[in-house]
Amino acid sequence: CRGAHEEVIALSEKLNAPVVYTFKGKMEVQYENPYEVGMTGLLGMPSGYYSMHEAEVLLMLGTDFPYSAFLPDDIKIAQIDIKPERLGRRAKVDIGLCGDVRMTIQALLRMLDPKTDDTFLLKQLKRYEGVKKDLAAYTENKGDINKIHPEYVMSEIDKLASDDAIFTVDTGMTCVWGARYLQATGKRHMLGSFNHGSMANALPQAIGAALAYPDRQVVALCGDGGLSMTLGDLETVVQYKLPIKIIVFNNRSLGMVKLEMEVDGLPDWQTNMLNPDFAQVAEAMGMTGFNVSNPEEVLTTLLNAFELDGPVLVNIMTDPNALAMPPKIELGQMVGFAQSMYKLLIN
């Protein structure tokens, strides 16, 4: 939906329809949108999930969202995409239109009659307000020593970053916090390994973004697992004098891998990490490095990092037990988690 923000709003207004977006489309759709009800997918929100599943018709705009389990299979689906091979690839489509999203919506707006009943829209907006309150509650508790709440950290980054910042997010738990707590402004951009889900993407993408857009703030949001795979890139950042702000969400584990294993009923195996002092590594490479283990020092350290010229790495000791709940919990997920805990106890 890039470049079609106004058209999406106009279509939603005419149909009194809620708008749901994917993680990849968040920065293009969320901002200044009175009809948005949150994100869908594993990192998404109940309001986004249920809006799609309680609707009678779903219109998919320029999306190749790969997680079919989150798409409804018992309602009518229409899809617009400029690439014909994407039509019907992820879900059974009743109507498929091949074309530019912006131009196609413009044509449709002239043919559609306004829908005056806003009952469904208001129901979903009310649910979304509750979801937002729940998400905000996680940021009110900063956490404890060496167990800083990542939700709080990401919410502070959102407040401090510039309106046109470029964020890069590592695959894993960092993606969850970025998806839920970084807000779109219409000028911000977010990069990640959204199609492939490969690890260790944040720092290389940040290097590319900083070289391509030297006048914009670039923030690399790294997991400790991802950063461990790309430590050599810190030298590249210094060599090219790139003023990237590198924030490490250091939960001393491969958090998302661990969670996926538990959901599948597997005992935790080789997901805990023995990390180096990332701040000292950064200093050895020639950039400024900070360690943060006290939640009361998060805000002042982030402020210092954003105000300093040149590259900075902030290594924040986050809570390894912070959970990312999916928008809808299935029975199989609960059974798998219980099996995982049982196997761990036996062993």
Where are these regions (language model features)?
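A short, gly/pro- and small-residue-rich
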Residues: 10-16, 68-86, 187, 326-341
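Thiamine diphosphate
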Residues: 5, 42, 49, 88-98, ...
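Glycine-rich, acidic loop regions that bind phosphate or pyrophosphate groups
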Residues: 25-126
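A short acidic, amphipathic alpha-helical/loop segment
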Residues: 4-11, 67, 73, 156, ...
